[in-house]
Swiss-Prot record:
It is an enzyme of class 2 (transferase). Pfam families: PAPS_reduct (PF01507). The gene is mmcV. HAMAP family: Sulf_adenylyltr_sub2 (MF_00064). It comes from the Bacteria. It comes from Streptomyces lavendulae. This is Sulfate adenylyltransferase subunit 2. With CysN forms the ATP sulfurylase (ATPS) that catalyzes the adenylation of sulfate producing adenosine 5'-phosphosulfate (APS) and diphosphate, the first enzymatic step in sulfur assimilation pathway. APS synthesis involves the formation of a high-energy phosphoric-sulfuric acid anhydride bond driven by GTP hydrolysis by CysN coupled to ATP hydrolysis by CysD. Belongs to the PAPS reductase family. CysD subfamily. One of its GO terms (molecular function) is ATP binding.
C-alpha cells in the first residue's frame, strides 16, 4: 500500500478510473476525501478507536485510506479481527503479511476460544458467522474501544443502507435504528455515554464498483481468491461453497472443480463463490459493472436466513 498515491484521474476505456468533475476532482477523489475526513474526525473525537481488519477487500481499502489520512505519521489505531476459525487460508496469510509489513498491532478475538469455554455452541449448520458478535463485543469491552471502524457499505444490504456513518451502539453493543442521529453535511456527532461505543463506516457511500475502481487506481494488492482461479466447490442454495469438515458437502452434494472467484470474504461455510473468468482488476471491474446482483445477495448464505437477517444481527451487536 502506498499512501502517497492518488489524485484526479481521467476515465479510461477499461472503466477503472473515476470521471473528472468540473472542479478537477474525480468521483473517487471525492469519496476518498470524505473517508479521510471521517478518519481524522474520529481521531479528534475519540480516545481508543480500532479498525476491524479481516483481510477482505473493504477492510484493505479502509486501511489504505487510514494510511493516507495520517501519512507520514503512522496509523494511530490498532487493528481487530474476529477470527471464526473457518477462514480462507489465503486471506489469513495476506492479513498477517500486511500487519507485519506495516508494523501495526493486531488484536484477534477467537470464536473458538468462546466455544471451548462454553460461552458459545456450534450451530447445526456449521457456520460460525453469526457467532462473531460475542467475541467482538468482548474485545470492545476488554480493550475499552470507544470507536470501531467497519467496512460496511450502504449498497451491500438494506439494513446497512439505513445505518448512519457514526452508528451509536448501546452498553450491550446493540443497534437501535430509532436512536440514529441526523448527519447534516459532514457534521458527525460522536458523543456517547459510558459503556456505549460508536461504529464508524468510512465506506458508507462507496459501492462495490467504487471499491474496485479505487483498488485499480491505487494499485492495492488483494488476496488471490478475489480473482478467478480453479477451486473445489459444491452447490447448495444456488451458491458454490467450499468443502470443509464444518459445512459439507452433505449427502447428495457433489464436489467439482470450477473456475470461480469470491466477491466477498467471510466464514468459509457460508460464503459462496461465483463462476468467473475475471483474472485481473480490469476484468473484475468490467464484470461488476454488468452484474445485477449485489455481492452479499449473490454470495452470503447467512443473509438468506430471513428478510431481516442482517438487521436482527446488528441489533444484537453484529458488525
Amino acid at each position: 500500500m502506498n499512501p502517497g498515491r492518488g489524485g484526479a484521474y481521467a476515465a479510461g476505456r477499461d472503466g477503472t478510473r473515476g470521471t473528472r468533475r468540473p472542479h478537477g476532482l474525480s468521483h473517487l477523489d471525492l469519496l476518498e476525501s470524505e473517508s479521510v475526513h471521517i478518519f481524522r474526525e474520529v481521531a479528534g473525537e475519540f480516545e481508543r478507536p480500532v479498525i476491524l481488519f479481516s483481510g477482505g477487500k473493504d477492510s484493505i481499502v479502509m486501511l489504505h485510506l487510514a494510511l493516507k489520512s495520517f501519512a507520514p505519521a503512522p496509523v494511530p489505531f490498532a487493528l481487530l479481527h474476529v477470527d471464526t476459525g473457518h477462514n480462507f487460508p489465503e486471506v489469513i496469510a495476506y492479513r498477517d503479511r500486511v500487519v507485519a509489513a506495516l508494523g501495526l498491532r493486531l488484536e484477534v478475538a477467537s470464536v473458538q476460544d468462546f466455544i471451548d469455554n462454553g460461552t458459545l455452541r456450534e450451530r447445526p449448520d456449521g457456520t460460525r458467522n453469526p457467532l462473531q458478535t460475542v467475541p467482538l463485543l468482548d474485545a470492545i469491552g476488554r480493550h475499552r474501544f470507544d470507536a470501531v471502524f467497519g467496512g460496511g457499505r450502504r449498497d451491500e444490504e438494506k439494513a446497512r443502507a439505513k445505518e448512519r456513518v457514526f452508528s451509536l451502539r448501546d452498553e450491550f453493543g446493540g443497534w437501535d435504528p430509532r436512536r440514529q442521529r441526523p448527519e447534516l453535511w459532514r457534521l458527525y456527532n460522536g458523543r456517547h455515554a459510558p459503556g456505549e461505543h460508536v461504529r464508524v463506516f468510512p465506506l458508507s457511500n462507496w459501492t462495490e464498483l467504487d471499491v474496485w475502481q479505487y483498488v485499480a487506481r491505487e494499485e492495492i494488492e488483494l488476496p488471490t481468491i478475489y480473482y478467478a482461479h480453479e477451486r473445489e466447490v459444491f452447490r447448495r442454495g444456488g451458491m458454490w461453497l467450499a468443502p470443509g469438515e464444518w459445512g459439507g458437502p452433505r449427502e447428495g452434494e457433489a464436489v467439482e472443480k470450477r473456475r470461480v472467484r469470491y466477491r466477498t470474504v467471510g466464514d468459509m461455510s457460508c460464503t459462496g463463490a461465483v463462476d468467473s473468468a475475471a483474472a485481473t482488476v480490469a476484468d473484475v471491474v468490467a464484470e461488476i459493472a454488468t452484474s445485477r446482483l449485489t455481492e452479499r445477495g449473490a454470495t452470503r448464505a447467512d443473509d438468506k436466513l430471513s428478510e431481516a437477517a442482517m438487521e436482527d444481527r446488528k441489533r444484537e451487536g453484529y458488525f
